[in-house]
UniProtKB/Swiss-Prot annotation:
The active site is at D74. It catalyses: Hydrolyzes single-stranded DNA or mismatched double-stranded DNA and polynucleotides, releasing free uracil. It is an enzyme of class 3 (hydrolase). GO terms for biological process: base-excision repair, AP site formation via deaminated base removal. HAMAP family: UDG. This is Uracil-DNA glycosylase. One of its GO terms (cellular component) is cytoplasm. NCBIfam families: PRK05254.1-1, PRK05254.1-2, PRK05254.1-4, PRK05254.1-5, ung. Its EC number is 3.2.2.27. PANTHER family: URACIL-DNA GLYCOSYLASE. Gene3D superfamilies: Uracil-DNA glycosylase-like domain (3.40.470.10). Its main location: cytoplasm. It holds the Pfam family UDG.
Length: 231
């Protein structure tokens, strides 16, 4: 059997992020992720998001422009939902319950009318990294790739962004996301914590005012605030 290796040049991620994450791509755990991925594909297992969208969060959010990180857990596992951006779904796909609550909070906080589309690409293009901790999932099986090693990759990204950038906003929603707080230097960055926006979570997300708080912080550190309206 042919030995599996990592050819960094072939990873579908833009050049700035590729350089930023080069060391991670060369680590043993990333090779293990690739092995598991190829093994699943060889068994004709359906994986979301599609291969060309796995690194979509990075390809839409320029590294030089990054301002905010919104951390999700793993991709949606139903057909046509996952697009490589945490909480986001493509245009013309029914808006999931968690995203509905995010839109409700935007209305409460900034008087933004809830969008008809759940595609958050316009946020990403302004510098919002919509990062899932786990970057892939088997169809119809939530958290099915949680043992693959993706968390090591996303943890390294959070830690590296914290160390090498300043004046970022990290939005941590729910206990899983809040557990990543230890990776972030709170003397350089703003950490905003709330309950998960899922309707299954106990109260604590609605009323958090994270979107206005983030923009106030960005202005304070001399950055252009985010236009949270969905385009």
């Amino acid at each position: 059997m042919e030995e599996i290796t990592i050819n960094i040049d072939k990873i579908k991620i833009n050049d700035d992020w590729k350089e930023f994450l080069r060391d991670e791509f060369q680590k043993k755990y990333f090779l293990e992720i690739k092995k598991q991925y190829l093994n699943a594909i060889n068994q004709n297992i359906i994986i979301y998001p599609p291969a060309n969208l796995i690194f979509n969060a990075f390809n839409l959010c320029p590294l030089k422009e990054i301002k905010i990180i919104i951390l999700g857990q793993d991709p949606y596992h139903q057909p046509n939902q996952a697009m490589g951006l945490s909480f986001s779904v493509p245009k013309n796909v029914k808006i999931p319950p968690s995203l509905n609550n995010i839109f409700k909070e935007l209305q409460n906080d900034l008087n933004i009318t809830p969008a008809k589309s759940g595609d958050l690409s316009s946020w990403a293009k302004q510098g919002v990294l919509l990062l899932n901790s786990i970057l892939s999932v088997e169809a119809n099986k939530a958290a099915s790739h949680s043992s693959w090693g993706w968390q090591e990759f996303s943890d390294a990204i959070i830690h590296k962004l914290s160390n090498e950038k300043s004046g970022l906003v990290f939005m941590l929603w729910g206990n899983y996301a809040k557990s990543k707080e230890i990776l972030i230097d709170n003397t350089k960055h703003l950490i905003l914590k709330a309950a998960h926006p899922s309707p299954l979570a106990r109260t604590g997300f609605l009323g958090c005012k994270h979107f206005s708080k983030a923009n106030e912080f960005l202005k304070k550190v001399g950055k252009i605030p985010i236009d949270w309206k969905i385009v």
